[in-house]
Amino acid sequence: MDAPEEPQPPVVYTMENKPIVTCAGDQNLFTSIYPTLSQQLPREPMEWRRSYGRAPKMIHLESNFVQFKEELLPKEGNKALLTFPFLHIYWTECCDTEVYKATVKDDLTKWQNVLKAHSSVDWLIVVVENDAKKKNKTNILPRTSIVDKIRNDFCNKQSDRCVVLSDPLKDSSRTQESWNAFLTKLRTLLLMSFTKNLGKFEDDMRTLREKRTEPGWSFCEYFMVQEELAFVFEMLQQFEDALVQYDELDALFSQYVVNFGAGDGANWLTFFCQPVKSWNGLVLRKPIDMEKRELIQKQEATLLDLRSYLFSRQCTLLLFLQRPWEVAQRALELLHSCVQELKLLEVSVPPGALDCWVFLSCLEVLQRIEGCCDRAQIDSNIAHMVGLWSYAMEKLKSLGYLCGLVSEKGPNSEDLNRTVDLLAGLGAERPETANTAQSPYKKLQEALSSVEAFEKHYLDLSHATIEMYTSIGRIRSAKLVGKDLAEFYMRKRSPQKAEMYLQGALKNYLAEGWALPVTHTRKQLAECQKHLGQMENYLQTSSLLASDHHLTEEERKYFCQEILSFASQQEDNPGHKVVLPMQFARLKDLHFDPPNAVVHAGGVLTVEITVCSQMPIPVHVDQIAVNVHFSIEKNNYRKTAEWLTKHKTSNGIITFPAEASLFPASQNSLPALELSEMLERSPSDNSLNTTGIICRNVHMLLRRQESGSSLEPPSGLALEDGAHVLRCSSVTLQPGANKIAFKTQAKEPGTYTLRQLRASVGPVWFVLAHIHPIVQYDVYSQEPQLHVEPLADSLLAGIPQKVKFTVTTGHYTVKNGDSLQLSNVEAMLILCQAENRAVVYSNSREECSTALLRIQSSDKVTSIGLPTAPAYHVIEFELEVLSLPSAPASGGDTSVPGTPELHRKQKDSQRAGHCMVTTDHKVSIDCPWSIYSTVIALTFSVPFRTEHSLLSAGTRKYVQVCVQNLSELDFELSDSNLEDKGHATDLRLAPLNTQSQQLIHSKQSVFFVWELTWTQEPPPPLHCQFSVGFSPASEEQLTVSLKPYTYEFQVENFFTLYSVRAEILPASGAEYCKTGSLCSLEVSITRLADLLDVDKDEALVESEDYFSTKLMYEVVDNSSNWAVCGKSCGVIAMPLAAQATHRVHMEVMPLFAGYLPLPDVRLFKYLPHHSAHASQLDADSWIENDSLSVDKHLDDQLDCSSLRSRGSTHSTSSSEHKGLPMPRLQALPAGQVFNSSTGMQVLVIPSQDDHVLEVSVT
């Protein structure tokens, strides 16, 4: 302890540094225990809980145990943590009280006094118990007495600062327990010391950083302080925390540089603005670059020195963290930021010095990463390293240009001097790389030594970079490097090698739509093609560049003149043609005349195109031609003027899509920009520092567009040969839009498709291989046609109607004297008027001429003279035709409309008959251009529908005629008349209509009534003809007299034979009928005439005194107001004598209160079947069964439900008579039965005991 003080060696800052623990007391004892202690201490981890809420960590503690010396204790103001002893241990194995008092106690007292003098409170006393010594000394006190004395003398309130280690060199459980307790205590005290001292150090460091705005603050001094903290974390193997310290220093220095660029510079930054004199690159092969650290400590480091040292420390820690790819990423950012920081600080850098530093640094980082990773790891992480390869290649290229190693003649003396100066700035090679054959230093020195060496190194770097970019899918970057390589080959006069790279880059830029790179690459490619003598390719590229608006006007004119000069030089060799794509001009639109692009054979068609020239100067074109492909359409109908007119564009203008981009990656296919505002404010006063716009989907916008097809125009262009070509010679194309017109005379019918547009300038032909969209014009040859159609929707019979005649001449020329011969139809007249005119139209519907029609009519033929007209014209004229009106004769007699069923039948038939009756007239027309007749059919609709009915009032009879107007016109009816065509003298028709003229509107009806009287009984049948004059109500006076409308019908057996009367009487003693009470129904059937011829049928029965006939009556109540009780029908024998009456009595019950209409009483003729079986049966039995048959002439609406309902209860009887001949019911003719009770009503009052009152209102 009292040995003479030895000079302490300087602290070596290496990765082997460990926390210092001093050892005082028995050094021999510690030496014997040290191997076990150093091995056991880091074995178990301890949880380190740090201040400021930082997450706890598990650490393995190691220590550097050194002999205690007072010089090791830190002095006031010393901030070095690496030399700071974190714990002091005193070792003793004293077991004798006398020895303790004589020596140990005094030594402990001196030791503690020294610690107290330096304010060190982290100490520990270790008493080692040894059983061997205990056996040798029998009179010693127990061990505990020595420990107790030490604790009483030195520990006072800190008894845990004295620990016992029992037999540390033995292998026993007791020894192991003692070691575990000791090691736990030692680790705990060490962690407590770390936490306390590091916390104090961080507070002091934070206080120093907060003084950075004071004038005397030094970044280098602060750098050393925070790096001391990083060293401690590294010493504790907390590499992440150590890296954070360097990152904070990096960010702090970068912010000061940015502020300096903005005009807010710190005074200490001037130390880093000194000129750069050394550019030997990064040093990454040793943990700490002490030379640069000393320069920083002395404030003599340049910006490159500081950045190099700072990155070397970050690199070391990242490699310990096994994150080598982050080293590459950070290195690339560092190199770029250093270049910018040198510009911001305006540091003087010799030309090429920074390129050397970047090149050496890139290779140093790459070799450092390759040294700690295997080949598989490197291959899978090329994406992180390729940026450094590319940057190194770029800087080597800059050095080559700077030192004249790329020029054709090689470096000159000035270039050599510059090379010597650059190599001198590299200094001597570092010892750690002196024995490495491919060290960055040697590579740079070799590359700058000769032209051949530079080319070798540059090509190696370029090819390696291209291969790496391609392998990771960064095709754009690979093509960009390829462009640089092409530029290098062009300088080396090797254009054949450069072309491949330029073509690849151009294809990529075209695929993705990068306009400016396309222009720049094409310029390089044009130069390359010119050197190679590829004249066709050069002219093609020149035409693209001449029309490229990204170039200046002078550049565009130069390339345009190149094309014109070549064309003028080749005029001596007219047979040689150079075919190029038409890139300098764009087809804008095309206009046809006629507009529908349809012309007849022999007609003239004009095609006018608009060509936009993108040349900067007017270009004289020898010839512009359009190659036309001819095809014959098999479908002849497609060639008719009608079809072509309907299916062609009306304006005749076809617009071609603007080729806004030759690139498939058009703006329409890209997603919309997602822009957001970015504001950065100062944390101190919230003032706005920077503002900008961020694109959040830039990864989508800049994504590569794969393209499998070539985007350059196809090289195999050829001029199409054909017989059909539209030409226009000697045209000067001005910059912008130029209109060029082609005229052609159509000869052969078919479809002509415009295929290829070409322009010639001397032997140079510019070709637009395909015109898209498809452009066609049609030439047709049409047969003459005649088309007849009404002007209205439908032709009405009976009034003059206009018909339009359309003659399409087709290829036929109508000569003077040609006429249409119409065969006359008996029921249709052709009205001739003096003012009839024919109009001749051209094929484009332009009126050519008008002429009066020459119409000559005879009994059989009407001749219409046609005006002269050339081929493919249209003749139109109108004629009036008149179809004679008629109505179909009625089929026979109508029923007497006395019952509701008959009214319903009439209404239903009216609903079904709202369509007009039509009449077809076929007219045969002979045309001058054909030997065959043309037959046309004209359909006329009869505007009226007529119905008749017989009305009865007792024995008086009336005939009613209903005329319904089904057309859309209003008519005026006049002179209605009804006459007997049989001319019977004993019949007379007396009209009851007072008006001579009546207006009938559309969809309305007019009724006419006549009273029918006769003098002979019975009257004969009536055969009538109704006629009425009509004319359109809206027309003026017609020039032709119209025939009246006629309608014929016949009425037979219209006289009254039977009169039926029904009467309902209340119950006996009651004044009114009541609901629910039986009432008496009296039906009387009266014969009004004696035996007539109409009665002589199967129902006639002859007796001794008179004739009779069998009738069946039926009482029916369709309105369900009455309930018939008992039988509702029966068969009676009616005497055939005038005034013979048959009465029937039955009971009915009213179901509702109110005025109720009487039930209907119906009469039928009952016709028995004359057979043996039938004569043996009673008539009533026939009525009762369910097998009554009704004559097929019976009215459809006859309701026999009562019969069926009664018969359903006698199904057994019905089955018994199955197969027997059945009687028949026959309806009486219309008008023979008159029901005088029709329309009568009976008052029914409600019963007094009804709880619910139901009243029927009719």
Swiss-Prot record:
Residues 1201-1214 have a biased composition (Low complexity). GO terms for biological process: endoplasmic reticulum to Golgi vesicle-mediated transport; intra-Golgi vesicle-mediated transport; vesicle coating; vesicle tethering. Pfam families: Ig_TRAPPC10 (PF23604), TRAPPC10 (PF12584), TRAPPC10_1st (PF23036). This is Trafficking protein particle complex subunit 10. Transmembrane segments: none annotated. InterPro entries: Ig_TRAPPC10 (IPR056917), TRAPP_II_complex_TRAPPC10_C (IPR022233), TRAPPC10/Trs130 (IPR045126), TRAPPC10/Trs130_N (IPR056913). Belongs to the TRAPPC10 family. Specific component of the multisubunit TRAPP II complex, which includes at least TRAPPC1, TRAPPC2, TRAPPC3, TRAPPC4, TRAPPC5, TRAPPC6A/B, TRAPPC9, TRAPPC10 and TRAPPC14. TRAPPC9, TRAPPC10 and TRAPPC14 are specific subunits of the TRAPP II complex. Interacts with TRAPPC14. It comes from Mus musculus. Disruption phenotype: Gene-null mice have smaller total brain area compared to wild-type animals, with specific reductions in the size of the corpus callosum, regions of the hippocampus, anterior commissure, and internal capsule. Only white matter structures are affected in mutant mice. There is a loss of myelination in these regions, but oligodendrocyte numbers are normal. Specific subunit of the TRAPP (transport protein particle) II complex, a highly conserved vesicle tethering complex that functions in late Golgi trafficking as a membrane tether. Residues 901-911 have a biased composition (Basic and acidic residues). It is found in: Golgi apparatus, cis-Golgi network. Keywords: ER-Golgi transport, Golgi apparatus, Phosphoprotein, Transport. One of its GO terms (cellular component) is TRAPPII protein complex. The keyword Phosphoprotein applies. Residues 888-913, 1201-1222 are annotated as: Disordered.
